[in-house]
């Protein structure tokens, strides 16, 4: 198993709360999920890498990874303290397929998309057979997760959603492609595959086989933390700020909702992040 955290916010937001301050932050969860960590942040000027570190496939994601347990890694704690943006995908790993290594640490980045997975797939060969040679050639690690990412990117390629200057309905094309792909995998009993997948403007969230919770935090709903953690530790909650959070576990005492098994949703970034439900069996249950 692994643990995921995703945030889509209406304005630049500091992510220290979910990464290290909350009682169920990724730093705390890494006590059991000790095989590496990764943070991918999008949407803040400081998240744009310098030219020497920039890849044409990275978009404007700023990615940091490590192989130590996050809560015991000074580098993670320092990065978590200053990580900010409008979109976050973060992950701590408990390995099931592939050794502990940077190449096997999530999130993975290709063609401007970031991806993190929680679960285990049962038939890699079948998934590879339905993945393009171009995407298979981009795999650098040993995980089933990276194969799943390559498979989903293949479906996005076929829908025209990964091309630079994609048409105005690329978001809907991407949604149809991801919905079809996840429905197929569920029907084939491909295994457990919770995931977060984002291009920085939208974030796809899927639950199948592992726990996943959602919280919509409105401009007038500041966080309420256990153990006396001050919400102001992550910066003031401004009158305009609106965010949607997704996590493998409830991070706070707020009214998180459990996503039903088989749910796919899309969170669109904007002045008021919008949740779109292309594939939600029963919506959410508190």
Residue ranges and their predicted role:
Residues 87, 163-209:
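Catalytic core of PPM/PP2C metal-dependent serine/threonine phosphatase domains
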Residues 2, 113-123:
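Conserved beta-strand-loop-short alpha-helix elements that form
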Residues 2, 39, 89, 148, ...:
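A residue-level signal for conserved active-site and pocket-lining positions in enzyme catalytic cores
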Residues 130-157:
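Long, charge-dense
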Residues 221-264:
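A conserved acidic, glycine/proline-rich C-terminal tail/linker
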Residues 67-82, 90-111, 129-135:
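Short acidic (Asp/Glu) patches
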Residues 1-68, 263-266, 271-285:
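Extreme N-terminus nucleophile/cap motif
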Residues 139-141, 209-231:
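Gly/Ser/Thr-rich active-site loops/lids in small-molecule metabolic enzymes
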